[in-house]
Structures are given as structure tokens and as C-alpha cells.
Design a protein with these regions (language model features):
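C-terminal beta-strand-rich structural cap/linker in extracellular carbohydrate-active enzymes
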Residues: 533-552
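Short catalytic/ligand-binding loop motif for oxyanion handling, primarily in non-cytosolic enzymes
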Residues: 21, 54-58, 101-108, 202-205, ...
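Hydrophobic residues within beta-strands of alpha/beta enzymes
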Residues: 46, 194-196
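Acidic/aromatic-lined carbohydrate-recognition and catalytic surfaces
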Residues: 2-184, 188, 201-253, 263, ...
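Loop/helix patches that line or flank the sugar-binding groove of alpha-linked glycan CAZymes
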Residues: 4-5, 228-244, 251, 259-273, ...
Length: 552
């Protein structure tokens, strides 16, 4: 576990990071060009979103060739160079693989459509019901039915996601063999990590049936045989190598995640789960607006941290990624008077937890949601689908746009803001997605020139994790659970105790400090606090972490 307990992983959405060709799309050489910046931040691994050949119906998660590079991003030589140059800087490369489905443009699916029985069995082809309707009533994660009818046929194929993303049948050993070959191909290329997309939906039941209680997910989420599949994947590919693996787990539960990530189970290094990012979803609905339920947020964090600590599971720690709106205006305040303290509060909240922190590109400089005003500014397939769905459900276009400004995945996919030049220094061409309007004020160049910027606070967080074993693997205990607006916890090991306090409020707040920490060292504060007392008055959005050495 130590190989990833001290690391911080930085997520790059290649399409939006840095463009070296002027075509408006970020590329692999653009990541290589910015390695020195990432080394200065202190991260030790870069997770890249998909860069494979793809029709780009779901921004690369519709993969048409697992072992090639889309010319949009460069060539295989560029990936080889990136891996080599990153390694020189003690940075590993983690790639994103989608093992649940392929693009309908993938040769496997094309051969299946052409009637090849070998590849036909790679996918879920099923006959329509007697009345011609889809085989089941399952709902796609992107809206609509999860089955698509083949033209001129009574057959359908299953797609839990976009209609161009056909689900693979993991019960077929030939499918598993082909996917293991893909993973080993990239290990041989020097890749040191894998982020495995929607991994816990790969195991479907033998018989697919209607769901009269929901949308079908209860049949395939953490489905039958999932742990056996992951053990086989581990054994056949990355198991005996120093490879870090993280599984993205959709609508999962703690018990399964402990099994996925406990090293004794020999499945994965860690898991992504999203329960904490649904605390502003009324009745679990993403496309309705509501305030964050802070008590629920605290409860989720504490429950997962305690269970994972006690049962030796391992969490990926994150607020932001390419599928989520940015956290800054969502979980804290993006108002100018609170901007710095909110951004640093969010960073400290998860970086002192037990797990491996992930920093999403731009988070370290305080990038925010762009809140584009019209649907013409958005390109995300899920957003465009729901623009139509929500209006059909009776909302006005203006009401729908207010939801999209807060919920769209494009919020986190706007180009990285490097400087105050045209297009924020991202490209000399026309960017594939608009640059946020605040790029003149919020950018890397400005952050690096100010030693009290959000960037340097994140740099300190990353360095502290490398330095202190108690942050890496110490036990986790909730603290001050009854205090509203306060999220706090203790970390401890044989030699050290750590108390991390985070005030999610816009007003001052008084708390009592436990006696054991009255002589503690201030490890980190976003208000430059130097002294502490038994009664502390916390400032708005203050984060304070104390460290106390235990007496021998």
C-alpha cells in the first residue's frame, strides 16, 4: 500500500490541457511540454483521460481502438516520449481504459454486425419482445432506453451509456482475453497505472429482465461475478507488477468497495465512488438543483473513511473530475471575498484524509465553472440530451439553462488557463470548447508569480503527505461531529496524532480544542494562524491542521 499512500495523482483531460499544433484541441506533446510545471507542483503520477481513436461521441470514452492513439492527440511515439520524460521527473503515467463497452465503430462491433459469430458473442444482442419493444426496460445512464434496435432487424444491442457505446459481455472468456491483452499492451509500453472506467457494471446477470422497481441498475451494479472477474484481471495483467489501479464505481456500496480495494483480495489498489458528490441531488436526481446537504456530506465522508480504515480498503480522494462540475462554487463559496479560503479549504479537507488524493487540472489554481449562457456553448452529449429531455418534461429553456450551468460536465472540461493571453495560452487556434471568461485573472502564470496563491498551498499539501506517515496511513476518527458547518477528523499512528478542522461557513465559528492538542504544532492553516488556544474562533472557510507527537 505504501507505493500509493504517499502519492498525489494529477488528472489531465488531454483535449483541454495544452495544444501544440494550433488545431484547438489539446494533445499528448502538450502534456510533455508542461511536465516541469507538474513536477513543481509535486505530483507523482498523471492520469490521462482517453486518447485512443474514437468518434468522440462521448469525448473519447467511446473507444474504437484500444491500442492506438487518435491523430487528434498525436501518435504512439508521442505517448512513448511522454512516459519517458515523465519518468525522468519521477512521475508515472496512468491511463484511462473503458472495459465495459466499445464504440460501435470498433472493429469488434463492426465484425459482429457483419455476422461474425465469434465477435457477435462479444456483445449483448437480444431479440425484441413479442410486441417489438426493447428486450428490457432498462434506462441508459445518458437518458432513454438502454437498447438500440438494429436497422431492418428485430434485434437490439445493449448500451448502458451512449447509443454508440455497445456493452461487452464479460461472461464470454474471449472478451476477457482480448481485454487482458489490451492491459498488457500498455504495461509493456511503460504505463504505471490504470484508471478503469465504470468498472463495477461489467458483470451482468445471465438472464436480462425488466426492472419494475427502478432503471435496471440493481441488476448489474456490483453484479454477479464482479469480484471473480477483477481477481482474474489482476492475476492476468497488473497483479505482480508495481502498477496502481483505480476502479470507477458507479452507485456502489462500502462493502463491495472494501473488497475491491483491500490488498488481500487482489483486485484493485483503490476505488472512485461518488456518494459525496450527490449531496445536492434531490431524491438522487442530478438534473434538479438543490443546496448541498452538509450534514449528509459529513456523514458520508466519516462513514466511508472509518469503514475503509477499519477494513483495510483504500479510497481515491477527490472533489473534481471531468464528469463533475467544479467544486469551488458548489461546496464552498466562489465569491471574491471567500475565493482563496474556499479553494484551499476544499483542498485541505481531502488531502489530510486516508486515501490517495487526486487533483483535477486547474483545481490547483482555483478554476471555476464558466456558466456559459446558451446551449450553443456546450458540446457534452449528456448535457445536450438533457437540454431536450428537461424541456419535454415541462421546464422552460431558461430554467433548463440554469440547471446546465451548475450540472454540465463541460464545466470542468473548459481549456486549462495558462496565462492572460488569447485563449488563456491554451491554443493559437479556435479552442474546441470555449475558454472561461475569468482566464485573465485566474491562470497558471498569475498563480506562480504569487507565493501566497492557491497553487503554493496545494504544493504544500502534496509535500506534507510525502513527509508524514500519519497522513498516509494513520487511523481515522471523526471529530466535532455535532458542530454545524464544521467537518473535522483525527488521524493517528504509533508516534503522531493529527487534528484536521475545516469550517464550511461564511461566518466566524467558535469551537473547543481537545486538551491533547493544546501544545500541538500548526501544520497548515489558510489564514497563516500561528497560535492556538483551548477556545478557537475559526474564520470563514478556515482550514486548520494540527500535529502532536505522542509521548514515548
Amino acid at each position: 500500500m505504501t507505493k500509493f499512500a504517499q502519492k498525489t495523482i494529477y488528472q489531465v483531460y488531454p483535449k483541454s490541457f495544452y495544444d501544440t499544433t494550433g488545431d484547438g484541441t489539446g494533445d499528448i506533446p502538450g502534456i510533455t511540454a508542461k511536465l516541469d510545471y507538474l513536477q513543481e507542483l509535486g505530483i507523482e503520477m498523471i492520469w490521462l483521460n482517453p486518447f485512443y481513436p474514437s468518434p468522440q461521441n462521448d469525448n473519447g470514452y467511446d473507444i474504437a481502438d484500444y491500442t492506438a492513439v487518435d491523430p487528434l492527440f498525436g501518435a504512439m511515439d508521442d505517448v512513448t516520449t511522454l512516459i519517458k520524460e515523465a519518468k525522468k521527473r519521477n512521475i508515472g503515467i496512468m491511463i484511462d481504459l473503458v472495459l465495459n463497452h466499445t464504440s460501435t465503430e470498433h472493429p469488434w462491433f463492426k465484425k459482429a454486425l457483419a455476422g461474425d459469430p465469434f465477435y457477435r458473442d462479444f456483445y449483448y444482442f437480444r431479440q425484441a419482445k413479442v410486441d417489438g419493444s426493447p428486450p428490457t426496460n432498462w434506462v441508459s445512464k445518458f437518458g432513454g432506453n438502454a437498447w438500440e434496435k438494429l436497422p431492418g432487424s428485430s434485434e437490439y444491442y445493449l448500451h448502458l451509456y451512449d447509443v454508440t457505446q455497445a456493452d461487452l459481455d464479460w461472461a464470454n472468456p474471449n472478451v476477457r482475453e482480448a481485454l487482458f491483452d489490451v492491459v498488457n499492451f500498455w504495461i509493456d509500453k511503460g504505463v504505471e497505472g490504470f484508471r478503469l472506467d465504470v468498472l463495477n457494471v461489467i458483470a451482468k446477470p445471465k438472464f436480462l429482465e425488466d426492472d419494475f422497481e427502478g432503471d435496471g441498475r440493481r441488476f448489474y451494479t456490483d453484479g454477479p461475478g464482479i469480484h471473480a472477474y477483477l481477481k482474474e484481471l489482476h492475476e492476468r495483467t497488473f497483479g505482480d507488477k508495481a502498477i496502481i489501479t483505480v476502479g470507477e464505481m458507479s452507485s456502489t456500496d462500502i462493502d463491495n468497495c472494501i473488497r475491491y480495494s483491500n490488498p488481500d483480495e487482489k483486485e484493485l489498489s483503490m476505488v472512485f465512488h461518488f456518494h459525496h458528490l450527490k449531496v445536492d441531488y434531490p431524491d438522487g436526481e442530478k438534473w434538479r438543483l438543490a443546496d448541498v446537504n452538509f450534514e449528509n456530506l459529513k456523514s458520508i465522508f466519516h462513514t466511508w473513511q472509518v469503514a475503509m480504515s477499519e477494513e483495510n480498503g483504500w479510497d481515491a480522494l477527490f472533489w473534481n473530475n471531468h464528469d463533475q462540475p467544479r467544486a469551488l462554487g458548489r461546496f464552498a463559496s466562489d465569491k471574491p471575498e471567500h475565493y482563496y479560503h474556499s479553494a484551499t479549504l476544499l483542498g485541505a479537507t481531502i488531502h489530510f484524509m486516508r486515501g490517495t488524493p487526486f487533483v483535477y487540472m486547474g483545481e490547483e489554481i482555483g478554476m471555476m465553472n464558466p456558466k456559459f449562457p446558451t446551449i450553443d456553448d456546450y458540446v457534452d452529449v449528456e448535457t445536450l440530451n438533457h437540454f431536450d429531455i428537461l424541456q419535454k418534461n415541462g421546464l422552460s429553456e431558461q430554467e433548463v439553462m440554469e440547471i446546465i450551468k451548475e450540472r454540465s460536465r463541460d464545466n470542468s472540461r473548459t481549456p486549462m488557463q495558462w496565462d492572460d493571453s488569447q485563449n488563456a495560452g491554451f491554443t493559437t487556434g479556435t479552442p474546441w470548447l470555449k475558454v472561461a471568461d475569468n482566464a485573465n485573472e485566474i491562470n497558471v502564470q498569475t498563480a506562480l508569480s504569487n507565493k501566497t496563491s492557491i497553487f503554493y498551498f496545494y504544493q504544500k499539501l502534496i509535500a506534507l503527505r510525502k513527509e508524514h506517515p500519519v497522513i498516509q496511513t494513520g487511523d481515522y476518527t471523526p471529530y466535532l461531529t455535532e458542530e454545524d458547518s464544521i467537518f473535522a477528523y483525527k488521524r493517528s499512528n504509533e508516534t503522531t496524532s493529527l487534528l484536521s478542522i475545516h469550517h464550511f461557513g461564511s461566518e466566524k465559528k467558535k469551537i473547543q480544542l481537545p486538551t491533547e492538542f493544546l501544545n500541538a504544532e500548526v501544520l497548515l492553516s489558510n489564514y497563516e494562524r500561528q497560535r492556538i488556544s483551548s477556545e478557537l474562533e475559526l474564520a470563514p472557510y478556515e482550514t486548520l491542521t494540527l500535529m502532536q507527537m505522542k509521548k514515548a
